[in-house]
Amino acid sequence: MSKIIGIDLGTTNSCVAVMEGGEPKVIPNPEGNRTTPSVVAFKNDERQVGEVAKRQAITNPNTIMSIKRHMGTDYKVEIEGKKYTPQEISAIILQNLKASAEAYLGEPVTKAVITVPAYFNDAERQATKDAGRIAGLEVERIINEPTAAALAYGLEKQDEEQKILVYDLGGGTFDVSILELADGTFEVISTAGDNRLGGDDFDQVIIDYLVAEFKKENNIDLSQDKMALQRLKDAAEKAKKDLSGVTQTQISLPFISAGAAGPLHLELNLTRAKFEELSANLVERTLEPTRRALKDAGLSASDLDKVILVGGSTRIPAVQEAIKRETGKEPYKGVNPDEVVALGAAVQGGVLTGDVEGVLLLDVTPLSLGIETMGGVFTKLIERNTTIPTSKSQVFSTAADNQPAVDIHVLQGERPMAADNKTLGRFQLTDIPPAPRGIPQIEVTFDIDANGIVNVRAKDLGTNKEQAITIQSSSGLSDEEVERMVKEAEANADADQKRKEEVELRNEADQLVFQTDKVVKDLEGKVDAAEVAKATEAKDALKAAIEKNDLDEIRAKKDALQEIVQQLTVKLYEQAQAAAGAQQAEGAQGNAGAKNDNVVDAEFEEVKEDK
């Protein structure tokens, strides 16, 4: 069975891993890094992903970051006159990770387990699955990030019974999950979170502070200057990381703007204490879901055996201190917060292929599910933190006499009124026979699969007529749209590959021109002048083809020149060997003469020892 890769599709960074020899291993990208920035840039019809895209973000307005924050919404980003959905941008990142995995494994990769924040709703999960399909991946399972982290942590500790709290603060989302580990079973008891809280917000408080300080000093608002803002973002992210290791950092941005007197520079010292003051409310916002998760699990902090920190933002000292204060436990530092989620996804991939045995994962739905009933009330059918997969049915009736149809309004959330919760979808059950209100019996059934994706059925128990939908949110893509995007993604991947091959061909041609010059110079006066002239002529023809940028001509001229250069190189080696042979013969003669002159024959007699 082919390998199933594990992918942590992050807000700021992504990571891919695979099971090898019973162990999950992170797959490095072509630059040798173990994580890849979740950044996509478009430049001259070329798509760039990762570090190369992030590096040119200051000068390229067609750079997209933190697209994960828009998953499951109808947000679109316009690039060079074309609109892209968050699923399409995420698919470009996934294609890049897929290519890294294929290069590492040396075989095609078609299946993946992709992680999502535990607090992702149905629309966000569907969008993630669609992104995988567009990237050419069969998404075998969607699993929650904290659960994946627990899988990676607990793989070697299956014989220990323990309750663990996973505190996952990533680039754009925050989750906390509480799990019980026992006999290879990883059971999630509760989960809570905030999908609008992460490392980006910590960067933002530094950016806001820098903008305010610069405005106070120079009366210029840098937030209105896109290029300056991107430089501020890069500086803020670097300062945040620096302050995890030192107590003070220097932020220096020369020529950030210009005033009447000339260029203006931003120079500022930021202390860890000031950063902690600026971000105090963000740290506090992580504690409320932590308390809620403990309450839902029916546990107190003292019942916990381990607290595991996941996500790059948990390196912030104030965050570590806050969770230590809240739980009374020193956070466990034995996992890499940037990689552990991808490793856990790879473990789940191994479970699905049978490479990992004796592991059972029981996850929960993060939000309650239900329908709108009379008076705009939200009636829950499945409570949050219910173990999935699960199914639940309830019988409802009509609200008016002779009502011919019922509208089923499917919602997800915790508020008592329907209007305050997230709409997942609507559908209609029609052809209900005329009857007084309250008589028809309409059975509504909710199914949640192992990916946390919802299916809803409504059935008239009198006629057995049934209507069913898989939830499609306003951002949900139809099969036709996904197919179209898959074809576009494949075409773009082919175009990217072709562009790469073109660049490689030009590089090889340039290298050959340089090599020819060197060979011709080395052979000057050593071979027939006609042969040198032939090589020079072929080299000039190749240079002309390179300047014309005619790829077919470059290929043909390169092949022709390569053959000539090979023949000349053979002659060069033959001459070198002939010269070496002559030198050796000369040396041997000299040695023979030396022997006759200097060697003296000596007499010796055997001395026998007395016995």
Curated annotation (Swiss-Prot):
Residues 600-611 have a biased composition (Acidic residues). InterPro entries: ATPase_NBD (IPR043129), Chaperone_DnaK (IPR012725), Heat_shock_70_CS (IPR018181), HSP70_C_sf (IPR029048), HSP70_peptide-bd_sf (IPR029047), Hsp_70_fam (IPR013126). The keyword Chaperone applies. Induction: By stress conditions e.g. heat shock. SUPFAM superfamilies: Actin-like ATPase domain, Heat shock protein 70kD (HSP70), C-terminal subdomain, Heat shock protein 70kD (HSP70), peptide-binding domain. Keywords: ATP-binding, Chaperone, Nucleotide-binding, Phosphoprotein, Stress response. It comes from the Bacteria. The keyword Chaperone applies. GO terms for molecular function: ATP binding; ATP-dependent protein folding chaperone; unfolded protein binding. The modification Phosphothreonine is found at T173. Residues 581-611 are annotated as: Disordered. Residues 581-594 have a biased composition (Low complexity). Belongs to the heat shock protein 70 family. Acts as a chaperone. This is Chaperone protein DnaK. It comes from Bacillus cytotoxicus (strain DSM 22905 / CIP 110041 / 391-98 / NVH 391-98). The lineage of its organism: Bacteria, Bacillati, Bacillota, Bacilli, Bacillales.
